[in-house]
Amino acid sequence: MYQRNILVEQTDPEVWAAIQAEDRRQEEHIELIASENYASPAVMAAQGSQLTNKYAEGYPGKRYYGGCENVDVIEQLAIDRIKQLFGAEAANVQPNSGSQANQAVLMAFLKPGDTILGMSLAEGGHLTHGMPLNMSGKWFNVVSYGLNDKEEIDYDALEAKAREHKPKLIIAGASAYALRIDFERFAKIAKEVGAIFWVDIAHYAGLVVAGEYPNPVPFADVVTSTTHKSLRGPRGGIILMKAEHEKAINSAIFPGLQGGPLEHVIAAKAVAFKEALSPEFKQYQQQVTKNAKVFAETLIQRGLRIVSGRTESHVMLVDLRAKGITGKEAEAALGKAHITINKNAIPNDPEKPMVTSGIRVGTPAITTRGFKEEETRLTANLVADVLDNPHDEANLEAVRAKVHALTSRFPVYR
């Protein structure tokens, strides 16, 4: 028998100390990694509930185990809410991650050796879209599209490659592309060559919900996403699809890839989806894009080059070559100043993937903690200050003090 008042700090002081240290890091550091955000206390409470104890192989109303009547209610709520958010015909909320959601799409529609057409990882795509070391690159014949000389998706070249290679599946979506994607044009190309059209909106999902980024659901056969990042939920994945594909996708998730779903995480997803249906969430996403625009403009004013020259979303790539430092060096220097960011390859990057010539910046997390244009401009200037003198310890100390002054005014959790 367990007593409900027994806490981690009593039973495992070592783990508790690390949790507390991470809590301090999140509160005291400015988070600019585009794929990170802060889940609400309600989302975290749902994920930490007794639902973690329940096995529930199958789907609502069709379970292998008994005693699933309560998790059925929760999972159906999550399904109904995510369908409402995106206007989707059908949805699966069981994927444990975005990568597993993507694997399910490949399993549902393809056989090993089939041809897929996805965005090159070197020009902004994601590793699950055909990177050679990923399952998607090992099992399938991969053809890649990329950017034109304006660093925008080259739709003409994409169309030509689709006609030449006749892929069975075409992928839209990226992990490091700041501009809007023309999903309607993608859909027309896919229809012309008889391909399944799949969109991965892991980065853009929250913006889509709020109307700040185009919604691919009316055009795509299937759409995948993570549930953290801009959706601000727990770590996990979802799949949206046309009703005709529901059976194939559901079978690919279970029993194809997963066994018992994580119902405590699905409960947290349901809570996050309800939050995303609120007017406040739309206002939040509007501020995310405002902050991103201000951040990019400020960095440009400070002499830095933004890939594509602008952002039309929450994210931007910064070319560091003019500063004479690598992305790896910038990440380390900014980390010392308590600004968390990630190194990132830029198009046609001459550096190795673990070094890079750029960094990726995103505004979802700083917007969650309450930053508006003024605080965002200040943050961008602090980033530029570090990049101007990345090896000057006095400079890093001065920036760190300003970071702490700012984060103390805008706590993540009060």
From Swiss-Prot:
Residues found modified as N6-(pyridoxal phosphate)lysine: 229
One GO process term, biological-process aspect: tetrahydrofolate interconversion
Pfam families the UniProt entry points to: SHMT
Binding site for (6S)-5,6,7,8-tetrahydrofolate: 121, 125-127
Subcellular compartments: Cytoplasm
Known catalytic reactions: (6R)-5,10-methylene-5,6,7,8-tetrahydrofolate + glycine + H2O = (6S)-5,6,7,8-tetrahydrofolate + L-serine
Origin: domain of life: Bacteria
Essential cofactor(s): pyridoxal 5'-phosphate
Annotated pathway: One-carbon metabolism; tetrahydrofolate interconversion; Amino-acid biosynthesis; glycine biosynthesis; glycine from L-serine: step 1/1
Enzyme type, top EC level: transferase
EC numbers: 2.1.2.1
GO cellular component, one term: cytosol
The entry's keywords: Amino-acid biosynthesis, Cytoplasm, One-carbon metabolism, Pyridoxal phosphate, Transferase
An example molecular function term from Gene Ontology annotations: pyridoxal phosphate binding
Site description Plays an important role in substrate specificity, residues in chain: 228
Xref: NCBIfam families: PRK00011.1
Function description: Catalyzes the reversible interconversion of serine and glycine with tetrahydrofolate (THF) serving as the one-carbon carrier. This reaction serves as the major source of one-carbon groups required for the biosynthesis of purines, thymidylate, methionine, and other important biomolecules. Also exhibits THF-independent aldolase activity toward beta-hydroxyamino acids, producing glycine and aldehydes, via a retro-aldol mechanism.
Xref: PANTHER family: SERINE HYDROXYMETHYLTRANSFERASE
Similarity comment: Belongs to the SHMT family.
HAMAP family: SHMT
Oligomer and partners: Homodimer.
Protein name: Serine hydroxymethyltransferase
